[in-house]
């Protein structure tokens, strides 16, 4: 599948039901058809009646847990919790400016120095001094700025 890659996918949600659904990896046809190209569906999911189930080789790379990203400490604090890519899409829409600032400071700490942060299209870092905005193929993403 991704031969030679050391890939780990970590997912969090504050809602236990959402985490449970992600762990099950089973999605109805209607859910799958919302924005996921057919070539990815066929490659990474098995068809089971009206549902699509994440293939075992993909599922073993995925770890989900219930977590509150607004808490005082991010759920990823260990030295080995350095991420190359973080997708934090449409998460901060409901947070205050101060909460966004605290969350993104924590994200900055766990993102590898050459890592990439993807936010939702209407989201921006609360503290732009920590981030460099880049554009590639119409997609905006952010890299952490390093202290000088």
Positions of PLM-derived features:
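Residues that form or immediately flank small-molecule/cofactor binding pockets and catalytic motifs
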Residues: 14, 69, 122, 138, ...
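Core SAM-dependent methyltransferase catalytic element
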Residues: 127-148
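Composition- and surface-driven signal marking solvent-exposed, interaction-prone regions
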Residues: 78-79, 100-103, 131-134
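A short glycine-rich, Lys/Arg-flanked "PGG" loop and its adjoining helix->strand segment in the class I
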Residues: 101-113
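Conserved beta-strand signature within the Rossmann-like core of class I S-adenosyl-L-methionine
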Residues: 113-121
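A structural micro-motif
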Residues: 5-7, 115, 131
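Extended basic-aromatic, gly/pro-enriched interface segments that bind polyanionic ligands
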Residues: 2-87, 91-95, 99, 125-126
């Amino acid at each position: 599948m991704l031969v030679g890659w050391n890939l780990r996918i970590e997912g969090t949600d504050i809602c236990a039901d959402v985490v449970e659904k992600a762990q099950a990896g089973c999605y109805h046809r209607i859910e799958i058809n919302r924005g996921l190209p057919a070539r990815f569906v066929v490659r990474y999911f098995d068809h089971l009646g009206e549902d699509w189930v994440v293939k075992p080789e993909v599922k073993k790379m995925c770890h989900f847990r219930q977590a509150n990203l607004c808490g005082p400490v991010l759920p990823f604090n260990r030295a080995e919790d350095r991420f190359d890519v973080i997708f934090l899409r449409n998460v901060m829409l409901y947070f205050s400016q101060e909460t966004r600032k605290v969350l993104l400071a924590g994200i900055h700490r766990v993102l590898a120095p050459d890592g990439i942060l993807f936010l939702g299209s209407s989201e921006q870092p609360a503290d732009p001094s920590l981030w460099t905005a880049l554009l590639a193929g119409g997609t905006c993403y952010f890299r952490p700025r390093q202290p000088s």
